[in-house]
């Protein structure tokens, strides 16, 4: 079985989230992935927990932020696909399968994202995907809006052909 995906989790003092995050990844229906945690110099017991649970981890000496950590993870990944997660995430059992299915639909797709629902308010969106204006301004779709409004992909049923 070929591993196709590396799931990179940035962690900084996130021990209180780690167990639930890892358990949700262990429950995936798609088996062809590896989990790699990049720890940003945690001091809350995360380092010991990751070692005790034998989680594949790169330990950084200081906090490099989310982008610094995931960039280290991306450089270490040896798979065609990478998924980037924060440590305070729980995913449903089809998450990896759906992400791999979505990106595999066309060689022209270079990035996919999922709906993110607020953990403590599961009827509200945290993020329904990043959007960019023609002027290059970035914004998040759906923040704080009802989750039920974001069931379909933003461009569901629309084909865009190059000129």
Annotated model-derived regions:
Residues 60-77, 87, 98:
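Glycine-rich, basic loop-to-helix element that forms the pyrophosphate-binding segment
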Residues 82:
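Short aromatic/hydrophobic "clamp" motif used to bind/position activated sugar donors
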Residues 13, 25, 40-41, 64:
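Conserved short acidic donor-positioning loop in nucleotide-sugar-dependent glycosyltransferases
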Residues 125, 137-139, 145-163:
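A recurrent flexible, glycine/aromatic-enriched loop bordering the glycosyltransferase active site
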Residues 90-133, 137:
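Conserved donor NDP-sugar-binding/catalytic core segment of glycosyltransferases
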Residues 44-52:
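Acidic helix N-cap motif at the loop->helix transition within catalytic regions
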Residues 33-41, 58-60:
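Short beta-strand/loop segment that forms part of the nucleotide-sugar
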């Amino acid at each position: 079985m070929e591993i196709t995906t590396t799931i990179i989790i940035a962690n900084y003092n996130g021990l209180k989230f780690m167990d639930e995050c890892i358990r949700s990844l262990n429950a995936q229906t798609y088996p062809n992935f590896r989990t790699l945690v990049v720890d940003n110099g945690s001091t809350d017991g995360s380092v010991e927990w990751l070692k005790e649970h034998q989680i594949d981890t790169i330990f950084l000496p200081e906090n490099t932020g989310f982008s610094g950590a995931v960039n280290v993870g991306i450089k270490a990944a040896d798979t065609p696909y990478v998924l980037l997660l924060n440590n305070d995430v729980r995913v449903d059992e089809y998450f990896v399968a759906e992400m791999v299915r979505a990106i595999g639909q066309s060689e022209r797709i270079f990035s996919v994202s999922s709906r993110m629902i607020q953990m403590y308010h599961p009827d509200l969106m945290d993020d329904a995907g990043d959007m960019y204006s023609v002027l290059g301004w970035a914004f998040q779709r759906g923040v704080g809006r009802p989750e039920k409004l974001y069931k379909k992909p933003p461009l569901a049923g629309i084909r865009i052909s190059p000129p």
